[in-house]
Every structure is written in C-alpha cells, then in structure tokens.
A protein has these predicted regions:
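ATP-binding/phosphotransfer module of carbohydrate and carboxylate kinases, centering on a glycine-rich
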Residues: 1-67, 76-82, 99-107, 123-131, ...
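Phosphate-binding/catalytic loop of phosphoryl-transfer enzymes
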Residues: 67-69, 75-179, 183-184
Length: 242
C-alpha cells in the first residue's frame, strides 16, 4: 500500500465529489455527497470539515495525506486564499475556506477555481501544449471558463478574470445568482437546461433529452446561446486550443 496521497475535492452547486490519488497519480477512492444536504445549516467550514473527517476515517487511516486540493465554482482572490463570490452556493462568500479547513484538519489545503483544475486535467490528458493560449468552457450548474496563457491560468488583478458566465447578454432580464440581471448563464447553463426540461419536457428523462428532442427550437436556442458565449471569447483571444 502506498503511504502518501493527495485528496481532490470538487465542490459544485449540486454535488461534492471527493477522490484520493496515490503516489502514481492514480485514483484510488471516490465518493459523492449532496451539496444541498451538506450545506443545509449554512455553516460551510464546519460542514465540509465533518464530511472530510468521515472520508479520512474511512479511507486514509494508514496513509499520509500530503495535501487537500479544492476546486470551487467561485471567484477567488488573486492569492487564492479568499472566496469572493459563489453564485450558486449560499454562505461561501468572503470565506477563507482553505485556512479554516487547515486549522480544523491539520492538513495543507489549496483552493482554485474548479474550471482551472478541469483544464489542468484536460491539458494533461490531451497532451495540450503549454505554449500560447488555451481556453476551456465547461457547462455545469453554471458556466465555467478557464483561460491559460503559456501553461498558467489567467487570474487578473483581483482574481476574477474569465467569468464568462457573467457576461451580460443583450436584452437579458433574468435574475442571476450573482445578483445581476441578464448574465449569460441565465440562458446557457446546466440549471437553465433543467429549467427548460421541467417546463417543456417534464416526461422526458434528462439523459434522453437531446436524443429525443434535439430538433426542437427550445433546445436549439439553448445550444445557440452556449455557442454565442464561447464564440465571443474565441474571437477575443484567438486561442491555440479550446
């Protein structure tokens, strides 16, 4: 048995996914819990600490955890210490989550935007070059966007670069979770697709939605909205890969 590991956590608006990798970067264990259930009492740090303690007790009694890496669908400070805003999860805004978890668990914790972690994996898995500009557009609960320049994520002065899901759409009036009106993820996101499914296709399983209804105008407009958002960034950055 390998005696060291790294724990990776993906905190989403729907689920929290936790995995452990061994010294060969191979996934050893994986669990998924409900974000809504975990954070229902509003005490984010303590609730997540409890989830992690249970995971550590179950899988890591005989190994040394070198680090916990957490991906969050949030805007983070440029030093990646503070969560600035999480539109789709209440109670996280302003938290120094990494510091609080380190104090509770005694294990080093790093925070990063979830989409940047996704792009790191895609870059590794698809053997993408570090040279030039690479972008990733990820449709989850919201719209995630990673911008990498010469192998490093673009954070911007305040850490909020690349918030593609919160670009205002012309004529948009829908209320976004961030507090603004007409953000792109109000029209092109996972939660918008769920909303459309419930309104127009209540009897169709989500997994079969595009198989059975791909020619419907409602879904075509949804796909066009995603394409519009992605194309805007492509035209601005002229990336080497997407």
């Amino acid at each position: 048995m390998n005696n060291e590991c790294v724990i990776g956590i993906d905190i989403g608006g729907t689920n929290i996914r936790i995995g452990r990798t061994d010294e060969n970067d191979q996934l050893v264990d994986f669990e998924r819990v409900s974000s809504k259930e975990t954070f229902k009492d509003g005490n984010i740090s303590e609730s997540l600490t409890e989830v992690l303690k249970n995971y550590l007790d179950k899988y890591c009694k005989n190994v040394q955890v070198k680090q916990i890496a957490i991906g969050i669908p949030a805007t983070l400070s440029s030093d990646r210490k503070q969560i600035l805003q999480v539109p789709n999860i209440k109670g996280m805004d302003g938290l120094f989550l990494g510091k609080e978890l380190e104090e509770n668990l005694g294990i080093p914790v790093v925070l990063e935007k979830d989409v940047n972690m996704l792009y790191y994996w895609d870059k590794y898995d698809k053997k993408l070059s570090d040279e030039g500009v690479g972008i990733g557009v990820y449709i989850g609960t919201g719209v995630g966007n990673a911008i990498f320049i010469n192998g490093k994520p673009l954070a911007g002065k305040d850490g909020v670069a690349g918030e593609l899901g919160h670009i205002p759409m012309i004529g948009g009036t829908s209320q976004c979770g961030c507090g603004n009106l007409g953000c792109s993820e109000c029209y092109a996101s996972g939660w918008k697709l769920v909303e459309l499914k419930e309104e127009y296709y209540p009897d169709v399983d989500m997994n079969d939605l595009f198989v059975k209804k791909s020619n419907d105008t409602v879904l075509k407009n949804f796909v066009d909205n995603i394409a519009c958002v992605a194309c805007a960034e492509i035209n601005i950055l002229n990336p080497d890969s997407i």
